[in-house]
């Protein structure tokens, strides 16, 4: 498989992978709301079995047909899997599209045997609000609403937050500069309310 994505996009995805990797559990993964499949492909080497599901098929899935990843269409509010089918379930930026996000979280918890990792962009990050909410029409959650949705699942959880963004210029210098800035922003307490990503790690008892 050849990854033809620009280096700045790859760096952004890899940074997010480094943030969630410590919470991976077991041998099997479900990427819920996988989109183009690029994130599933990054996570797959850490598991013996990887499946990925999205409401609509992406033409990009064909790129990964020889990787062993199983792609399926399906609704994450009603996943077509038995209880505890996967050790780890990961979701990134799908939940705000769900008609009932609480039901979607409960479904991910139902099909997980160990861990659910949920990532959603912070609605009130200044750059994300301009680019994703005002211009893109995405209704991302505030930190308060995100926590309410996670808590309503009834599964024990921890809330984490981190900084990650795509470098606006595809150059090694700018990519490094953006990543260094993200490292710095994570250490500044007053940046917390507008930091780029909210993450929940839900652990099955």
Segments predicted by a language model, with ranges:
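Conserved alpha-helix/loop element of class I SAM-dependent methyltransferases that forms part
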Residues: 8-26
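Class I SAM-dependent methyltransferase SAM/SAH-binding core
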Residues: 36-78
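A C-terminal cap/extension of S-adenosyl-L-methionine-dependent methyltransferases
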Residues: 71, 160-205
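A conserved beta-strand element that flanks and buttresses the S-adenosyl-L-methionine
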Residues: 90
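A short, conserved alpha-helix within the catalytic core of class I
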Residues: 98-107
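Conserved beta-strand signature within the Rossmann-like core of class I S-adenosyl-L-methionine
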Residues: 114-121
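Short, glycine-/aromatic-enriched active-site segment of Class I SAM-dependent methyltransferases
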Residues: 121-137
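Short alpha-helix
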Residues: 138-155
């Amino acid at each position: 498989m050849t990854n033809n994505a620009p280096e700045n996009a790859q760096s952004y995805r890899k940074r997010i992978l480094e943030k969630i990797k410590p919470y991976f559990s077991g041998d099997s993964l479900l990427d819920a709301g996988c989109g183009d499949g690029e994130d599933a492909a990054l996570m797959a080497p850490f598991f013996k079995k990887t499946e990925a599901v999205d409401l609509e098929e992406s033409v990009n899935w064909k790129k990964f047909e020889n990787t062993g990843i199983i792609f399926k269409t399906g609704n994450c509010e009603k996943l077509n899997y038995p209880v505890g089918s996967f050790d780890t379930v990961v979701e990134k930026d799908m939940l705000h599209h769900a008609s009932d996000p609480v039901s979607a979280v409960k479904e991910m918890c139902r099909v997980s045997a160990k861990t659910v990792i949920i990532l959603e962009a912070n609605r009130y990050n200044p750059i994300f609000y301009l680019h994703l909410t005002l211009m893109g029409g995405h209704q991302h959650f505030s930190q308060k609403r995100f926590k309410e949705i996670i808590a309503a699942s009834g599964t024990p959880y921890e809330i984490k937050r981190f900084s990650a963004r795509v470098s606006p210029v595809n150059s090694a210098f700018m990519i490094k500069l953006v990543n260094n800035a993200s490292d710095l922003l994570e250490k500044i307490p007053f940046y917390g309310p507008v930091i780029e990503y909210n993450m929940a790690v839900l652990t099955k008892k």
